[in-house]
Amino acid sequence: MRKPYTLVEILVAVSIIGILTATGLGITGYVRNKVAETQTKTTIKLIEMAFQKYNEKTGSYPVTEDKNGSDLTPFLAIEIPKDWTVNDLKWITAFNDVTLPQSTSTNPTASGLKIRGIRLEETNGSANHRKYYFLDGWGRKLICLNPGIFNSSTSYDLISFGGDKLAGDGSTKKSIRDCENEQQDIFKSQTFYPDEIGDDVTNFTRN
């Protein structure tokens, strides 16, 4: 007959299970962050390509302001009026694979914008508009500063605060919440992006 397990044996087994569980969760979290990072880099590259295509046709970069009342937030967004025409959406059509929303008598508000490879968040907007935010790999709103501050190659900055939701290593005390509450000049006092160890994803080389 097998002897019952001792208390020490039970504690050792529980400890091993706990260690394995913690290790597994850590690996899972790491993998999720890497997937989100890759998705964000892809999104930024697709946006850059579309912006460049638009610039070659018009000589300027598109206006991508997100209006929150009378304020401007730094999030990359587009508002589509229900009576839109293709000419109103020139910079969106600069993307290679776009499904544009249709406005019909049964669906009076333009909705359903899809861009292959990019996550979008659709909001109700207003009675006459539908707003879409561009999301990073973590499902958070992508930041676009236009005119930009940090990118010497283009006149705009694309920024994701990464998994920690903080700008850079957190030393600037800027977060996604700050972006929600502040105007577009959130980085106005900055001359360089203070990030060497942060998990942010940007379209410029950080110092």
Task: Annotate each language-model stretch with its function.
Residues 37, 41-207:
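N-terminal pilin/flagellin-like segments and related low-complexity appendage regions
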Residues 1-31, 40:
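N-terminal single-pass transmembrane signal-anchor helix
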